[in-house]
Amino acid sequence: MTDKKIAVLLPCYNEEQTIEKVVRDFKRELPEATIYVYNNNSTDRTAEIAASIEGVVVRNEYRQGKGNVIRSMFRQIDADCYIMADGDDTYPAEHAREMARMVLEENMDMVIGDRLSSTYFVENKRAFHNFGNRLVRWLINKLFAGNIKDIMTGYRAFSYDFVKLMPIESNGFEVETEMTINALDKKFNICEIPVQYRDRPEGSVSKLNTVKDGMRVIGTIFRMFKNYRPMVFFGLLSAVLFVLGSVGFMSVFIEYLQTHLVLRFPTLIVATVTILASIILFSSGLILDIIIRKHRQNALLQINCIKK
């Protein structure tokens, strides 16, 4: 791996308490790597401390949010392998070399540092975070036919191909969810390795808002489900409307058979419109599914060409 270019990516917002240790840990484990600290409008000494360490590249991203930071990192940095971690010292750098090896020698496109199979539920004392991780994992694996153990971990390794073909739309913490879904949809090579998670040191505060960011993650899942599985998404909506419309129509039709009169014109009109709406939704889902399949084929061909 010594002839390969490795980049360590550390997005940071107010991490003055931990950033020096995190940087030095990664320098120790991957001395050949270039370490990039992206400061995201920190109001403390994060950028100053990182810049004081020899060999560290410090850049600023003024658009607030982790997704904005990672988008800029992916656009601006070229490397054979990318290691991404948080600047809060919750992910041990000792796993970084093995993660890089799996990208460079085993042709993995994404190596996920799986916290949930090791110490996460013991170290993390925030019950709603634990519940949220389980819920997101269940949703994504069900909706996108995956088998990922840790969807929202911030500790990952990427190939050059994945980084340059990943269209990041998210602005905030939902970016990890977006990357995982995109990797599943485009059939990138994915693997997971257990990593020892440790809670933030005393005095270090999490930037994650459990409710607000949790809702963003759930919204991202359903937005991407609509975009990547339109036939299923619109088909389900169509089925619901068709059943409702049919129930209303049949009630009017049965009355007509009994009395030879249409006694409830408003119900008939609503039922007919509902059934028509269900047909339109089904047709839309079918058309979008054809478009998405073609787009997916083009993306896979592009990946194949790059891998040559």
Model-found features: residue ranges?
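Short, well-formed alpha-helical segments that are part of the catalytic scaffolds
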Residues: 14-28
